[in-house]
C-alpha cells in the first residue's frame, strides 16, 4: 500500500498506472514511490490537506481512498468530472478502473457532491457496507454518514436523488428527494424522516462557515466536533435541552465557545489528553457545565 500526499493527483496517478501496467508488482511499487515523491514536491504545502491511499489484494480490483485530514476540509475531481467536497476527518473510496456500468463510491463522514450528468452511468454513493445508497444521474447534494453514528442524512440541493435503505433484517426501503429536502435515516430500523430545510445551513461547512438556527445543542456539538476535530463532555444534562443560534466564519474553537458561554450561560474547559496509540498523539476534550448563580 502506498500513499500519495495530494489535493487532486488523480490524473497523475492514472497516467502513472498506464505506464506501469506491464511491469512486475515489485518494480511497479518502486516506480510508484518515485512518482509519489515528485507529486509531493510539486504540490508542496497542499500535501498536508489530504492524501490518496491506493490498495489492492490478490484477485481484487484496486481501490483509491481519498481522505481529508482531521480539522481540515478539501475538494477534488473524480475521473468522470464529478466534484467532491470532503469534510474534516472524512474519506471517499472507489474502484479502479472507474469505467463500469455505474459510478460507485463509498463515503465515511461528510461530503458534498456536484455530480456530472450521465444517463447511461448512474452515480451511487454507498455507506455502512451498502446498507445505505444514494442513486443519482446528475445533481448536487450533501451527505453525512459517520461510522460513529446510527443516523445518515442526505440533503438535496439540485436535481433529484433516490435514497435506498436496507434495515438490520434486510428489508429495503426507497424514497425520492426533491430540492431543499433532507432525509434523516435510522440505519437499523430503515426509517426515514424527510423535512424541508434551508440548504445554506447544511452546506456552509464547505466555505469554512458554521451556521446554526434554533438548533438543539447536542446537534451543535456534533457539528463542532467534526469541524474542529474535538470531543465534548457534558457534565450537566440540562445543557442538552438548550438551543443555539449563530453564524461563524474562520473562527477559532475558543471564539465559538466564548459566544456559547455568553449566549447560553455555559462554562467550558479545554483539556489536552493523550490518545491510546503508538504515536503518543494528543486529542482535545472540551468539558461543558452550566453556569452557577450569578457567574
Regions found by a protein language model. Name each.
Residues 1-59, 254-295:
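Extreme N-terminal targeting/processing segments
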Residues 2-9, 67, 210-213, 246-249:
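Alpha-helix initiation/capping motif
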Amino acid at each position: 500500500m502506498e500513499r500519495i500526499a495530494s489535493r487532486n493527483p488523480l490524473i497523475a496517478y492514472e497516467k502513472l498506472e498506464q505506464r506501469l501496467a506491464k511491469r512486475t508488482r515489485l518494480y511497479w511499487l518502486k516506480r510508484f514511490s518515485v512518482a509519489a515523491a515528485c507529486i509531493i514536491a510539486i504540490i508542496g504545502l497542499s500535501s498536508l490537506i489530504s492524501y490518496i491511499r491506493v490498495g489492492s489484494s490478490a484477485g481484487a480490483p484496486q481501490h483509491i481512498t481519498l481522505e481529508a485530514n482531521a480539522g481540515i476540509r478539501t475538494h477534488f475531481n473524480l475521473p468522470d468530472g464529478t466534484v467532491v467536497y470532503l469534510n474534516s476527518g472524512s474519506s471517499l473510496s472507489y474502484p479502479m478502473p472507474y469505467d463500469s456500468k455505474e459510478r460507485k463510491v463509498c463515503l465515511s463522514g461528510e461530503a458534498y457532491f456536484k455530480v456530472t450528468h450521465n444517463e447511461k452511468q448512474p452515480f451511487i454513493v454507498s455507506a455502512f457496507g451498502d446498507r445505505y445508497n444514494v442513486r443519482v444521474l446528475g445533481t448536487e447534494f450533501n451527505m453525512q454518514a459517520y461510522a460513529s453514528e446510527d443516523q445518515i442524512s442526505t440533503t438535496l440541493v439540485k436535481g433529484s436523488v433516490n435514497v435506498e435503505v436496507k434495515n438490520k433484517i434486510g428489508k429495503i426501503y426507497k424514497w425520492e428527494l426533491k430540492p431543499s429536502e433532507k432525509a434523516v435515516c435510522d440505519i437499523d430500523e430503515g426509517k426515514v424522516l424527510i423535512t424541508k430545510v434551508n440548504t445554506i445551513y447544511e452546506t456552509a461547512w464547505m466555505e469554512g462557515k458554521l451556521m446554526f438556527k434554533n438548533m438543539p445543542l447536542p446537534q451543535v456539538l456534533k457539528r463542532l466536533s467534526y469541524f474542529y476535530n474535538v470531543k465534548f463532555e457534558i457534565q450537566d444534562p440540562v445543557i442538552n435541552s438548550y438551543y443555539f443560534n449563530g453564524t461563524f466564519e474562520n473562527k477559532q474553537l475558543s471564539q465559538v465557545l466564548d459566544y456559547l458561554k455568553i449566549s447560553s450561560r455555559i462554562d467550558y474547559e479545554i483539556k489536552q489528553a493523550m490518545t491510546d496509540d503508538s504515536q503518543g498523539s494528543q486529542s482535545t476534550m472540551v468539558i461543558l457545565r452550566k453556569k452557577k448563580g450569578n457567574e
